[in-house]
Design a protein with these regions (language model features):
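ATP-dependent helicase/translocase motor core
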Residues: 1-5, 11-101, 114-351, 356, ...
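Positively charged N-terminal leader segments that act as targeting/secretion signals
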Residues: 102-106
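A cross-taxon signal for low-complexity, glycine/charged-rich
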Residues: 107-113
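Inter-Walker segment of RecA-like/P-loop motor cores
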Residues: 371-395
Length: 395
Protein backbone atom coordinates (compact mmCIF):
# COMPACT_ATOMS: atom_id res chain seq x y z
CA UNK A 1 0.00 0.00 0.00
CA UNK A 2 1.33 3.43 -0.95
CA UNK A 3 1.10 6.53 1.22
CA UNK A 4 -1.58 7.96 -1.08
CA UNK A 5 -3.66 4.77 -0.79
CA UNK A 6 -3.33 4.89 3.01
CA UNK A 7 -4.42 8.52 2.97
CA UNK A 8 -7.51 7.71 0.91
CA UNK A 9 -8.38 4.81 3.22
CA UNK A 10 -7.98 7.14 6.20
CA UNK A 11 -10.41 9.60 4.64
CA UNK A 12 -12.91 6.78 4.08
CA UNK A 13 -12.78 5.94 7.79
CA UNK A 14 -13.38 9.59 8.63
CA UNK A 15 -16.35 9.71 6.24
CA UNK A 16 -17.85 6.58 7.82
CA UNK A 17 -17.57 8.34 11.19
CA UNK A 18 -19.68 11.28 10.03
CA UNK A 19 -16.90 13.68 9.04
CA UNK A 20 -17.16 15.63 5.81
CA UNK A 21 -14.21 14.82 3.58
CA UNK A 22 -12.65 17.30 1.15
CA UNK A 23 -9.60 17.51 -1.10
CA UNK A 24 -7.29 20.32 -0.01
CA UNK A 25 -6.37 21.59 -3.50
CA UNK A 26 -10.07 22.15 -4.25
CA UNK A 27 -10.29 24.60 -1.32
CA UNK A 28 -7.01 26.35 -2.12
CA UNK A 29 -6.95 29.99 -3.32
CA UNK A 30 -6.59 28.77 -6.91
CA UNK A 31 -8.79 25.70 -6.47
CA UNK A 32 -12.19 24.78 -7.90
CA UNK A 33 -14.07 25.87 -4.76
CA UNK A 34 -11.69 28.21 -2.92
CA UNK A 35 -12.23 28.73 0.81
CA UNK A 36 -8.89 30.39 1.57
CA UNK A 37 -7.55 33.80 0.58
CA UNK A 38 -3.94 32.57 0.42
CA UNK A 39 -1.73 29.70 1.49
CA UNK A 40 -0.84 31.40 4.77
CA UNK A 41 -4.46 31.17 5.95
CA UNK A 42 -4.95 28.18 8.25
CA UNK A 43 -8.57 28.87 9.27
CA UNK A 44 -11.63 28.21 7.16
CA UNK A 45 -13.14 31.60 7.91
CA UNK A 46 -16.54 31.02 6.31
CA UNK A 47 -17.03 27.91 8.46
CA UNK A 48 -15.87 29.74 11.57
CA UNK A 49 -18.14 32.74 11.06
CA UNK A 50 -21.14 30.56 10.22
CA UNK A 51 -20.56 28.44 13.35
CA UNK A 52 -20.33 31.47 15.64
CA UNK A 53 -23.61 32.79 14.24
CA UNK A 54 -25.25 29.37 14.55
CA UNK A 55 -24.08 28.69 18.12
CA UNK A 56 -24.63 32.27 19.35
CA UNK A 57 -27.76 33.43 17.50
CA UNK A 58 -28.31 36.33 19.94
CA UNK A 59 -25.05 38.05 19.01
CA UNK A 60 -25.07 40.89 16.46
CA UNK A 61 -22.87 40.65 13.37
CA UNK A 62 -20.39 43.09 14.88
CA UNK A 63 -19.71 40.69 17.76
CA UNK A 64 -19.33 37.76 15.37
CA UNK A 65 -16.69 39.75 13.50
CA UNK A 66 -14.98 40.64 16.79
CA UNK A 67 -14.73 36.96 17.70
CA UNK A 68 -13.34 35.98 14.30
CA UNK A 69 -10.73 38.75 14.53
CA UNK A 70 -9.57 37.56 17.95
CA UNK A 71 -9.33 33.92 16.88
CA UNK A 72 -7.45 34.52 13.65
CA UNK A 73 -4.63 36.59 15.18
CA UNK A 74 -2.76 34.86 18.03
CA UNK A 75 -1.21 37.44 20.32
CA UNK A 76 1.98 35.59 21.27
CA UNK A 77 4.95 34.70 19.07
CA UNK A 78 5.38 31.56 21.19
CA UNK A 79 3.21 28.88 19.59
CA UNK A 80 2.67 27.03 22.88
CA UNK A 81 1.49 30.20 24.63
CA UNK A 82 -0.79 30.95 21.67
CA UNK A 83 -2.10 27.39 21.85
CA UNK A 84 -2.93 27.74 25.54
CA UNK A 85 -4.66 31.06 24.91
CA UNK A 86 -6.71 29.55 22.10
CA UNK A 87 -7.65 26.51 24.19
CA UNK A 88 -9.01 28.89 26.81
CA UNK A 89 -11.12 30.62 24.15
CA UNK A 90 -12.32 27.24 22.91
CA UNK A 91 -13.60 26.29 26.36
CA UNK A 92 -14.75 29.64 27.71
CA UNK A 93 -15.75 31.54 24.57
CA UNK A 94 -14.34 34.72 23.07
CA UNK A 95 -15.09 37.92 25.03
CA UNK A 96 -17.12 40.34 22.90
CA UNK A 97 -19.16 43.44 23.50
CA UNK A 98 -22.00 45.21 21.77
CA UNK A 99 -24.52 47.95 22.40
CA UNK A 100 -28.16 47.18 23.11
CA UNK A 101 -31.23 49.12 24.16
CA UNK A 102 -32.93 48.40 27.46
CA UNK A 103 -36.73 48.02 27.22
CA UNK A 104 -38.53 51.38 27.18
CA UNK A 105 -40.91 52.18 30.04
CA UNK A 106 -43.55 53.38 27.59
CA UNK A 107 -44.19 53.48 23.86
CA UNK A 108 -43.30 57.17 23.76
CA UNK A 109 -39.88 56.68 25.33
CA UNK A 110 -36.74 55.23 23.84
CA UNK A 111 -34.86 52.57 25.78
CA UNK A 112 -31.49 53.40 27.25
CA UNK A 113 -28.45 52.25 25.28
CA UNK A 114 -25.92 50.22 27.25
CA UNK A 115 -22.78 48.21 26.57
CA UNK A 116 -23.23 44.43 26.86
CA UNK A 117 -20.30 42.18 27.78
CA UNK A 118 -20.77 38.67 26.36
CA UNK A 119 -18.94 35.63 25.03
CA UNK A 120 -19.00 34.05 21.59
CA UNK A 121 -18.63 30.28 21.76
CA UNK A 122 -16.70 28.61 18.95
CA UNK A 123 -17.86 25.02 19.50
CA UNK A 124 -21.14 23.65 20.82
CA UNK A 125 -20.05 20.91 23.22
CA UNK A 126 -23.64 20.12 24.12
CA UNK A 127 -25.02 19.57 20.62
CA UNK A 128 -22.91 17.50 18.26
CA UNK A 129 -24.96 18.50 15.23
CA UNK A 130 -24.38 22.21 15.76
CA UNK A 131 -20.77 21.74 14.67
CA UNK A 132 -19.20 21.08 11.29
CA UNK A 133 -16.57 18.32 11.22
CA UNK A 134 -14.28 18.21 8.17
CA UNK A 135 -11.25 16.06 7.33
CA UNK A 136 -9.22 17.65 4.54
CA UNK A 137 -6.21 16.07 2.87
CA UNK A 138 -3.20 17.73 1.23
CA UNK A 139 -3.85 21.06 2.95
CA UNK A 140 -1.05 23.16 1.45
CA UNK A 141 0.50 25.83 3.66
CA UNK A 142 3.09 28.50 3.02
CA UNK A 143 5.91 27.69 5.42
CA UNK A 144 8.79 29.92 6.42
CA UNK A 145 11.08 28.06 3.99
CA UNK A 146 8.82 26.38 1.44
CA UNK A 147 5.31 25.10 0.85
CA UNK A 148 4.28 22.35 3.26
CA UNK A 149 1.46 19.87 2.82
CA UNK A 150 0.16 17.96 5.89
CA UNK A 151 -1.55 14.74 4.86
CA UNK A 152 -4.84 15.27 6.74
CA UNK A 153 -6.04 18.23 8.81
CA UNK A 154 -9.19 17.87 10.93
CA UNK A 155 -11.37 20.96 11.27
CA UNK A 156 -14.25 21.67 13.59
CA UNK A 157 -16.12 24.84 12.64
CA UNK A 158 -13.19 25.98 10.52
CA UNK A 159 -10.63 25.47 13.31
CA UNK A 160 -7.70 23.11 12.50
CA UNK A 161 -7.75 21.05 15.70
CA UNK A 162 -5.76 17.98 14.60
CA UNK A 163 -3.07 17.04 12.09
CA UNK A 164 -2.34 13.55 10.77
CA UNK A 165 0.98 12.75 9.12
CA UNK A 166 1.14 9.40 7.34
CA UNK A 167 3.93 7.25 5.95
CA UNK A 168 3.68 4.34 3.55
CA UNK A 169 3.47 0.98 5.35
CA UNK A 170 5.37 -0.62 2.48
CA UNK A 171 8.28 1.79 2.24
CA UNK A 172 11.69 0.56 3.33
CA UNK A 173 13.66 2.51 5.96
CA UNK A 174 10.60 4.66 6.74
CA UNK A 175 8.53 4.45 9.93
CA UNK A 176 6.21 6.50 12.11
CA UNK A 177 9.11 8.45 13.60
CA UNK A 178 9.75 9.93 10.20
CA UNK A 179 6.18 11.20 10.45
CA UNK A 180 7.01 12.54 13.93
CA UNK A 181 9.98 14.45 12.49
CA UNK A 182 7.70 15.84 9.79
CA UNK A 183 5.31 17.13 12.47
CA UNK A 184 8.23 18.91 14.15
CA UNK A 185 9.10 20.54 10.83
CA UNK A 186 5.52 21.74 10.42
CA UNK A 187 5.61 23.19 13.94
CA UNK A 188 8.76 25.14 13.11
CA UNK A 189 7.78 26.33 9.65
CA UNK A 190 3.97 26.52 9.86
CA UNK A 191 3.49 27.53 13.49
CA UNK A 192 0.17 29.28 12.82
CA UNK A 193 -1.42 25.90 12.14
CA UNK A 194 -0.34 24.62 15.55
CA UNK A 195 -1.64 27.60 17.47
CA UNK A 196 -5.01 25.80 17.22
CA UNK A 197 -3.83 22.20 17.47
CA UNK A 198 -5.30 19.79 20.03
CA UNK A 199 -3.69 16.57 18.78
CA UNK A 200 -1.05 15.36 16.34
CA UNK A 201 -1.22 11.84 14.92
CA UNK A 202 1.61 9.92 13.28
CA UNK A 203 1.03 6.62 11.51
CA UNK A 204 2.21 4.13 8.93
CA UNK A 205 -1.17 2.42 8.97
CA UNK A 206 -0.10 -0.56 11.06
CA UNK A 207 1.09 1.68 13.91
CA UNK A 208 -0.52 4.94 15.03
CA UNK A 209 0.34 7.32 17.86
CA UNK A 210 -1.21 10.53 19.20
CA UNK A 211 0.65 13.30 20.99
CA UNK A 212 0.24 16.87 22.18
CA UNK A 213 1.85 20.00 20.78
CA UNK A 214 4.86 19.64 23.11
CA UNK A 215 5.05 15.84 23.33
CA UNK A 216 8.36 14.07 22.84
CA UNK A 217 8.56 10.74 21.01
CA UNK A 218 8.12 8.90 24.31
CA UNK A 219 4.84 10.74 24.94
CA UNK A 220 3.23 9.75 21.64
CA UNK A 221 0.78 7.03 22.63
CA UNK A 222 -1.38 4.44 20.87
CA UNK A 223 -5.17 4.57 21.04
CA UNK A 224 -6.51 1.07 21.60
CA UNK A 225 -10.24 1.58 22.05
CA UNK A 226 -13.32 2.75 20.19
CA UNK A 227 -16.40 3.67 22.24
CA UNK A 228 -15.30 2.52 25.70
CA UNK A 229 -12.68 0.57 27.65
CA UNK A 230 -13.98 -2.85 26.61
CA UNK A 231 -14.34 -1.89 22.94
CA UNK A 232 -10.90 -3.00 21.75
CA UNK A 233 -11.26 -4.39 18.23
CA UNK A 234 -8.55 -6.61 16.80
CA UNK A 235 -8.05 -4.47 13.73
CA UNK A 236 -5.08 -4.91 11.44
CA UNK A 237 -4.55 -1.15 11.22
CA UNK A 238 -3.98 0.91 14.37
CA UNK A 239 -4.79 3.95 12.24
CA UNK A 240 -8.34 2.64 11.81
CA UNK A 241 -8.73 2.36 15.59
CA UNK A 242 -7.37 5.90 15.95
CA UNK A 243 -9.81 7.37 13.43
CA UNK A 244 -12.85 5.39 14.60
CA UNK A 245 -12.02 5.77 18.30
CA UNK A 246 -10.11 8.95 19.06
CA UNK A 247 -11.87 10.87 16.28
CA UNK A 248 -15.36 9.63 17.09
CA UNK A 249 -17.05 13.01 16.94
CA UNK A 250 -18.75 12.85 20.33
CA UNK A 251 -15.66 11.48 22.07
CA UNK A 252 -13.34 13.98 20.37
CA UNK A 253 -15.42 16.90 21.66
CA UNK A 254 -15.35 15.38 25.15
CA UNK A 255 -11.59 14.95 24.84
CA UNK A 256 -11.01 18.58 23.91
CA UNK A 257 -13.26 19.79 26.70
CA UNK A 258 -12.00 17.75 29.64
CA UNK A 259 -8.74 15.98 28.81
CA UNK A 260 -6.23 18.70 27.94
CA UNK A 261 -3.98 20.28 30.58
CA UNK A 262 -1.21 22.89 30.47
CA UNK A 263 1.59 22.85 33.03
CA UNK A 264 4.78 24.79 33.63
CA UNK A 265 7.92 22.73 34.13
CA UNK A 266 11.12 24.68 34.94
CA UNK A 267 9.56 27.83 33.47
CA UNK A 268 8.69 25.94 30.27
CA UNK A 269 5.04 25.67 29.27
CA UNK A 270 4.04 22.14 28.30
CA UNK A 271 0.78 20.66 27.08
CA UNK A 272 -0.46 17.29 28.30
CA UNK A 273 -3.27 15.20 26.89
CA UNK A 274 -4.80 12.07 28.36
CA UNK A 275 -4.02 8.60 27.11
CA UNK A 276 -6.81 6.21 26.12
CA UNK A 277 -6.66 4.43 29.51
CA UNK A 278 -7.06 7.76 31.35
CA UNK A 279 -9.79 8.96 29.00
CA UNK A 280 -12.05 5.94 29.40
CA UNK A 281 -11.33 5.44 33.10
CA UNK A 282 -12.31 9.04 33.84
CA UNK A 283 -15.46 8.85 31.73
CA UNK A 284 -16.53 5.66 33.52
CA UNK A 285 -15.60 7.08 36.94
CA UNK A 286 -17.67 10.22 36.34
CA UNK A 287 -20.63 8.17 35.12
CA UNK A 288 -20.44 5.90 38.16
CA UNK A 289 -20.08 8.84 40.54
CA UNK A 290 -23.16 10.57 39.15
CA UNK A 291 -25.16 7.36 39.62
CA UNK A 292 -23.82 6.69 43.12
CA UNK A 293 -24.64 10.26 44.16
CA UNK A 294 -28.29 10.03 43.11
CA UNK A 295 -31.18 10.05 45.53
CA UNK A 296 -32.27 6.52 46.46
CA UNK A 297 -35.63 7.20 44.84
CA UNK A 298 -34.04 7.68 41.41
CA UNK A 299 -34.16 5.01 38.73
CA UNK A 300 -31.51 2.29 38.67
CA UNK A 301 -28.44 2.08 36.52
CA UNK A 302 -29.19 2.07 32.82
CA UNK A 303 -26.32 -0.10 31.65
CA UNK A 304 -23.77 -2.59 32.94
CA UNK A 305 -20.47 -1.35 34.34
CA UNK A 306 -17.17 -2.07 32.65
CA UNK A 307 -15.31 -5.25 33.58
CA UNK A 308 -13.56 -3.73 36.59
CA UNK A 309 -16.86 -3.53 38.55
CA UNK A 310 -20.14 -5.35 38.07
CA UNK A 311 -22.50 -2.59 39.10
CA UNK A 312 -22.94 0.67 40.95
CA UNK A 313 -26.05 1.25 43.03
CA UNK A 314 -27.93 4.54 42.75
CA UNK A 315 -27.59 6.55 45.93
CA UNK A 316 -25.03 4.16 47.43
CA UNK A 317 -22.35 6.90 47.58
CA UNK A 318 -19.92 4.20 46.43
CA UNK A 319 -18.72 4.88 42.91
CA UNK A 320 -15.77 2.49 42.93
CA UNK A 321 -12.00 2.57 42.59
CA UNK A 322 -9.74 3.40 39.63
CA UNK A 323 -6.54 1.36 39.66
CA UNK A 324 -3.63 2.33 37.41
CA UNK A 325 0.02 1.32 37.59
CA UNK A 326 2.86 3.55 38.77
CA UNK A 327 3.82 6.11 36.17
CA UNK A 328 0.52 5.82 34.29
CA UNK A 329 -0.44 9.45 34.88
CA UNK A 330 -2.82 9.18 37.81
CA UNK A 331 -2.45 12.90 38.60
CA UNK A 332 -3.74 13.83 35.15
CA UNK A 333 -6.58 11.33 35.54
CA UNK A 334 -7.55 12.94 38.84
CA UNK A 335 -7.51 16.44 37.33
CA UNK A 336 -9.61 15.37 34.35
CA UNK A 337 -12.02 13.53 36.65
CA UNK A 338 -12.40 16.62 38.83
CA UNK A 339 -12.84 18.94 35.86
CA UNK A 340 -15.50 16.77 34.22
CA UNK A 341 -17.35 15.92 37.46
CA UNK A 342 -17.55 19.55 38.59
CA UNK A 343 -19.37 20.42 35.36
CA UNK A 344 -22.01 17.69 35.63
CA UNK A 345 -25.33 19.42 36.44
CA UNK A 346 -26.54 16.35 38.37
CA UNK A 347 -23.79 16.91 40.95
CA UNK A 348 -25.12 20.36 41.94
CA UNK A 349 -21.73 22.08 42.21
CA UNK A 350 -19.94 19.56 44.46
CA UNK A 351 -16.94 20.10 46.71
CA UNK A 352 -14.06 17.71 46.02
CA UNK A 353 -11.50 16.77 48.67
CA UNK A 354 -8.24 15.20 47.50
CA UNK A 355 -6.49 13.14 50.18
CA UNK A 356 -2.86 12.01 49.92
CA UNK A 357 -0.64 10.01 52.27
CA UNK A 358 2.66 11.86 51.73
CA UNK A 359 3.53 15.53 52.12
CA UNK A 360 5.69 15.62 48.98
CA UNK A 361 2.92 13.98 46.96
CA UNK A 362 0.42 16.46 48.37
CA UNK A 363 2.49 19.37 47.11
CA UNK A 364 3.01 17.81 43.69
CA UNK A 365 -0.67 17.04 43.28
CA UNK A 366 -1.69 20.52 44.39
CA UNK A 367 0.69 21.99 41.81
CA UNK A 368 -0.89 19.81 39.11
CA UNK A 369 -4.40 20.87 40.10
CA UNK A 370 -3.36 24.53 40.28
CA UNK A 371 -2.01 24.33 36.73
CA UNK A 372 -5.38 22.90 35.63
CA UNK A 373 -7.45 25.77 37.02
CA UNK A 374 -8.88 26.53 33.58
CA UNK A 375 -10.20 22.98 33.30
CA UNK A 376 -11.51 23.10 36.87
CA UNK A 377 -12.95 26.60 36.29
CA UNK A 378 -11.86 27.59 39.79
CA UNK A 379 -8.76 28.03 41.91
CA UNK A 380 -7.96 24.96 44.05
CA UNK A 381 -6.94 25.56 47.67
CA UNK A 382 -4.69 23.51 49.93
CA UNK A 383 -5.31 22.67 53.58
CA UNK A 384 -2.22 21.96 55.70
CA UNK A 385 -4.15 20.68 58.71
CA UNK A 386 -7.59 19.61 59.90
CA UNK A 387 -8.55 23.02 61.27
CA UNK A 388 -7.84 24.65 57.92
CA UNK A 389 -9.86 21.97 56.15
CA UNK A 390 -12.81 22.50 58.49
CA UNK A 391 -12.67 26.24 57.89
CA UNK A 392 -12.52 25.83 54.12
CA UNK A 393 -15.45 23.42 54.12
CA UNK A 394 -17.55 25.78 56.23
CA UNK A 395 -17.05 28.76 53.92
Amino acid sequence: MTEDQLEQQCLEWFAEGGWEVAHGPDLAPDGEAPERADYRQVLLLADLEAAIRRINPHLPQSSVEQAVAVVRKPESLDVVVSNRDFHRLLLEGVPVEYKALTPALSQRERGEERLIQDRAFLVDFGDLNSNRFRAINQFTLEGSKQLRRPDVVCFINGLPLAVLELKSPGAENVNIWDAYNQIQTYKDECSDLFAYNEAAIISDGYLARVGSLTASQERYMPWRTLKHEDDKPLLEWQLETMVRGFFDRELFLDYIRYFVIFETDSDKLIKKIAGYHQFHAVREAVRATVIAARDMSDAGISEKRATYGDEVLPGSKKAGVVWHTQGSGKSISMCCYAGKLLQQPEMNNPTLIVVTDRNDLDGQLFATFSAARELLKQEPVQADDRDTLRRLLSE
